[in-house]
Amino acid sequence: QTVVMDKTGTLTEGKFHVTRQKAVEITPEEQLELAALAESASNHPIAQSLKEAYGKAIDTERVEDVQEIAGHGVSARVDGKQVLAGNAAYLEDAGLQPETPTEIGTAVHLAVNGVYAGYILIADTIKPDAAQAVQAFRQAGVSTVAMLTGDSESAAEAVGDTLQLDEVHAKCLPADKVQFMQAYRAKLAKGRTLVFV
């Protein structure tokens, strides 16, 4: 038997919080403000954590031309400045070279008017009963417990190690998760079960 779980909201609380900022060319306060405003239209948990960390009312009149690219990030004009906020691949596609954080968490990279402006590191908390759930699966005869996540490899591996998961797949977009599930289904022996939680 194989159980595959999505990380956010299943194994973790889905309540992200800012753990660290590395601002480049701008102040940390300006970095957080621009990120929160650029993400102001999004309901994604990461966007919510940025708005929460900003802690002020969001003036949507300051934000124009918002374009959200699912699984990658957002582009917006904030106070006339072109802001990109998203994962490393999103900024690389824009011709920038984002830094790779060494700390565990999900990095929201920022660019302002085509210049890299650093990253904001966001982390989630493992649910208190997640380890018990994994143990219960094992006791029920599940041979493989795997996790899919859009998070960075370091964040995914930290959760996988803590919960003693057999397989961890990071940097997954929604389409990647579907492909992983199809691959798991294809390699199942006859009579075996695949469950996605």
Give residue ranges: language-model regions:
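Cytosolic catalytic headpiece
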Residues: 1-197
